[in-house]
Swiss-Prot record:
Residues 190-199 are annotated as: Interaction with ANK1. The gene is Slc4a1. A lipid is attached at residue 859 (S-palmitoyl cysteine). The chain crosses the membrane at residues 421-444, 453-473, 477-493, 503-523, 536-558, 587-607, 619-639, 680-700, 717-735, 736-753, 777-797, 798-816. It comes from Rattus norvegicus. This is Band 3 anion transport protein.
Length: 927
């Protein structure tokens, strides 16, 4: 600990993920990205430093400019080859987002965030202020650059003329890289003498604390070294070469900063990438200067994107020095105290983000005159033309725009499917769509006495899915039955039973009204209303459905225990399709099957992102977790032959679930009794409620799938997709089949399965999205396979209902994962010191956060009461009332900043493997 008190460290956090998260927040407060054209860049404030005669002034604008390309920085140090006793430049470290150091055995250490010592930054500032700067140097070789730089050194009295030749030979020495060190006996820092022969340092070399830390970090805390990041460097990377060496005949440290006019490949560099910047740091051996750390400080500076932009555009030394000062202002100093815990260090990250926020804010600029035109409505914003929710003011204008935007890609929607990844996605999504279809089909049959069941749901999913894949604007959406629709079907069936109405005929009239409603909404471009549905309403909706799932699961289990109670003795049992009276072990086995299915599905879900087995195997097992769980528990039930369990009712072939009660075509005037005329017109009310549910799920799902972070290029169509989904549902009701909606989790899973990830831009960096296979074939094939599954009656009929209850419970529990409301409810029972470090905790007072949570809980309770009464049909209408509540009432109670933290969309699109995280955590919507 004593050594730590001799130095202060600077904590640098150039984390790409942190920067991206910060940019997302800063966009809300007029953040301007730094990757902008040169013409829009505001001139930096130059220090009042006069240009010297030797500053290389560019005669034309540099072609080097800030771009979105990745940066690669390489640090080479002058070393002594122990075997051949000759000097050479050795690659000591490189930066590809993160820092990677070369170990003594010639193997790269693990990538890590750069840390810098306080004195190294002070020394860097000192040498920068007296350095030589050559901007837009028109040289294409290392020798040419070295000659120009040494001439400038002499002109500015940085070095003596007699030192020129020695330094020139040194700069052009042989270069070695990681693979070359394996053939050497070792290297060590060397000091260049006047004769050109290396010498040992004049003073005994005692590694300083920062060098020890550097070596320890290079060796890594783990025994497993990192492979070289060379192959992971993206093409067209902006490359910087930093050279650090010791020369005993120099009087003082000298720095040369070179910006090439054209980025060109230089010989002897580890990569054939064009070099844009060259930094040379040379100086005499001194006990207070560690040139390795000085070089690391310079290299880290060149990886920082704000300084890199300035370095690309600077026209004078003053601008670079000003940017360096700004870099130092954003650096945190860790005082020499006792070693803190890791948790304490994490508290520094928000402080660093705040410093970065201020650094990224643009300087005040003159108002753009075009801004006033845009505010007056005279000119559209740059992205308005492509906004699918922008209203045109014409009848069916949005629908026509969707067709014109999306259908020109129709041919590519076919050709883009010629990829093995699409075939793999078809297999995966088939099981992801089949499992809930069978589960909801079985439960729907239970709720409606088999007036609709598995066969109707499978056929409806297949037919509507095929049509949507062929005609939809966003074919990556997966249509299916969902929890909210199941709740409505149960409520409407109860309503019809209590009023002596034919349920299946009433659905047909609802279908008529659905078609009329969707035509009117699409005609007047009503899809724009989805923008007013915030996370507040989505989470109440999702939480309610999750509670219903969980409640229904245990309600069904209790009913099984009531039908087959546990008794001390039983009469002899004759196994029949459905025995009458109590049966031994039926209730207990049903409990085991339900709990076993739930636990297996949860375990396999977590296993997907665990650290066991190779990643591909984990993902396969995790992605097929639900069907695997069903299969295992069906086998368990099959092997237990002497205990009865209620099975899924599936008709043989293309038959309706209850052929004695209905056929495939529903007569709108009534099947067995005359359907009352008043109900034909009154059906518009339940039709409106169904429309609200489908509108909410489908439009919000389209918003989530079409997020800009997913980098889809073909666009989407809210109006066209809504017309298809609701219209097909209305027609399906005439055939006694369920209406469907776009399902959020399944659609996000489909999009993820078709996303092609590029190689990571650097060691430790996250892989970037390369493209998304936007095509129609995967959805088409999945729908066909779901339709063919109706022929699997011998297999489906062996599934116990208790297994489906386990899947129902699984869907209810997992749906809570991405709901911030659930997290805030848990915080009600935690002391504030244990609250997480998230915006809605940090920026909002605890009691006001709990007040917001309480209001949501009250809304949730009201919805639950409505659902539990005969007025349960009105549930969607009561739900939609939370939208004006959020828009009109809550702003009177909470400040805008508080609402942004509590009701902001902070869900991120991520493809990184993180333990316990998947698609459920990304979407605050019901399954």
């Amino acid at each position: 600990m004593g050594d730590m008190q001799d130095h202060e460290k600077v904590l640098e956090i150039p984390d790409r993920d942190s920067e991206e998260e910060l940019e997302h927040v800063i966009e809300q407060i007029a953040y301007r990205d730094l990757d902008i054209p040169v013409t829009e860049m505001q001139e930096s404030e130059a220090l009042p430093t006069e240009q010297t005669a030797t500053d290389y002034i560019p005669t034309s604008t540099s072609t080097s400019h800030p771009s979105s390309s990745q940066v690669y920085v390489e640090l080479q140090e002058l070393m002594m080859d122990q075997r051949n006793q000759e000097l050479q430049w050795v690659e000591a470290a490189h930066w590809i987002g993160l820092e990677e150091n070369l170990r003594e055995d010639g193997v790269w250490g693990r990538p890590h965030l750069s840390y810098l010592t306080f004195w190294s930054l002070l020394e860097l500032q000192k040498v920068f202020s007296k350095g030589t700067f050559l901007l837009d140097l028109a040289e294409t070789s290392l020798a040419g650059v070295a000659n120009k730089l040494l001439d400038s050194f002499i002109y500015e009295d940085q070095i003596r003329p007699q030192d020129r030749d020695e330094l020139l030979r040194a700069l052009l020495l042989k270069r070695s890289h990681a693979e070359d060190l394996k053939d050497l006996e070792g290297v060590k820092p060397a000091v260049l003498t006047r004769s050109g022969a290396p010498s040992e340092p004049l003073l005994p070399h005692q590694p300083s604390l920062e060098t020890k830390l550097y070596c320890a970090q290079a060796e890594g805390g783990s025994e497993e070294p990192s492979p070289s990041g060379i192959l992971k460097i993206p093409p067209n990377s902006e490359t910087t070469l930093v050279l650090v060496g010791r020369a005993s005949f120099l009087v003082k440290p000298v720095l040369g900063f070179v910006r090439l006019k054209e980025a060109v490949p230089l010989e002897d560099l580890v990569l054939p990438e064009p070099v844009s910047f060259l930094l040379v740091l040379l100086g005499p051996e001194a006990p207070h200067i560690d040139y390795t750390q000085l070089g690391r400080a310079a290299a880290t500076l060149m990886t920082e994107r704000v300084f890199r932009v300035t370095a690309s555009l600077a026209q004078s030394r003053g601008e670079l020095l000003s940017s360096l000062d700004s870099f130092l202002d954003c650096s945190l100093v860790l005082p020499p105290t006792e070693a803190p815990s890791e948790k304490a260090l994490l508290n520094l990250v928000p402080v660093q983000k705040e410093l970065l926020r201020k650094r990224y804010l643009p300087r005040p600029a003159k108002p753009d005159p075009n801004l006033y035109e845009a505010l007056d409505g005279g000119k559209e914003g740059p992205g308005d033309e492509d906004d699918p929710l922008r209203r045109t003011g014409r009848i069916f204008g949005g629908l026509i725009r969707d067709i014109r935007r999306r259908y020109p890609y129709y041919l590519s929607d076919i050709t883009d499917a010629l990829s093995p990844q699409v075939l793999a996605a078809v297999i995966f999504i088939y099981f992801a769509a089949l499992s809930p279809a069978v589960t909801f089909g079985g439960l729907l049959g239970e709720k409606t006495r088999n007036l609709m069941g598995v066969s109707e749901l499978l056929i409806s999913t297949a037919v509507q899915g095929i049509l949507f894949a062929l005609l939809g604007a966003q074919p990556l959406l997966v249509l299916g039955f969902s929890g909210p629709l199941l709740v409505f079907e149960e409520a409407f069936y109860s309503f019809c039973e209590s009023n002596n109405l034919e349920y299946i005929v009433g659905r047909a009239w609802i279908g008529f009204w659905l078609i009329l409603l969707v035509v009117l909404v699409v005609a007047f471009e009503g899809s724009f209303l989805v923008q007013y549905i915030s996370r507040y309403t989505q989470e109440i909706f999702s939480f309610l459905i999750s509670l219903i799932f969980i409640y229904e699961t245990f309600s069904k289990l209790i009913k099984i225990f009531q039908d087959y109670p546990l008794q001390e003795s039983y009469a002899p049992v004759v196994m029949k399709p459905k025995p009458q009276g109590p049966v031994p072990n039926t209730a207990l086995l049903s409990l085991v099957l339900m709990v076993g299915t739930f636990l297996l599905a949860m375990m396999l879900r977590k296993f997907k992102n665990s650290t066991y087995f190779p990643g591909k195997l984990r993902r396969v097992i995790g992605d097929f977790g639900v069907p695997i769980s069903i299969l295992i528990m069906v086998l368990v039930d099959t092997f237990i032959k002497n205990t009865y369990t209620q099975k899924l009712s599936v008709p043989d072939g293309l038959k309706v679930s209850n052929s004695s009660a209905r056929g495939w075509v529903i007569h709108p005037l009534g099947l067995y009794n005359h359907f009352p005329k008043w109900m034909m017109f009154a059906s518009v009310l339940p039709a409106l409620l169904v429309f609200i549910l489908i509108f909410l799920e489908s439009q919000i799902t389209t918003l989530i799938v079409s997020k800009p972070e997913r980098k889809m290029i073909k666009g989407s169509g809210f109006h066209l997709d809504l017309l298809l989904v609701v219209g097909m549902g209305g027609v399906a009701a005439l055939f006694g089949m369920p209406w469907l909606s776009a399902t959020t989790v399944r659609s996000v899973t489909h999009a993820n399965a078709l996303t092609v990830m590029g190689k990571a831009s650097g060691p430790g960096a996250a892989a970037q999205i390369q493209e998304v296979k936007e095509q129609r074939i995967s959805g088409l094939l999945v729908s066909v396979l779901v339709g063919l599954s109706i022929l699997m009656e011998p297999i489906l009929s062996r599934i116990p209902l208790a297994v489906l209850f386990g899947i129902f419970l699984y869907m209810g529990i997992t749906s809570l994962s991405g709901i911030q409301l659930f997290d805030r409810i848990l915080l009600l029972f935690k002391p504030p010191k244990y609250h997480p470090d998230v915006p809605f905790v940090k920026r909002v007072k605890t009691w006001r956060m709990h007040l917001f949570t309480g209001i949501q809980i009250i809304c949730l309770a009201v919805l639950w009461v409505v659902k539990s009464t005969p007025a349960s049909l009105a549930l969607p209408f009561v739900l939609i009332l939370t939208v004006p509540l959020r828009r009109l009432l809550l702003p009177l109670i909470f400040r805008e900043l508080e609402l942004q933290c509590l009701d902001g969309d902070d869900a991120k699109v991520t493809f990184d493997e993180a333990e316990g995280l998947d698609e459920y955590d990304e979407v605050p919507m019901p399954v």
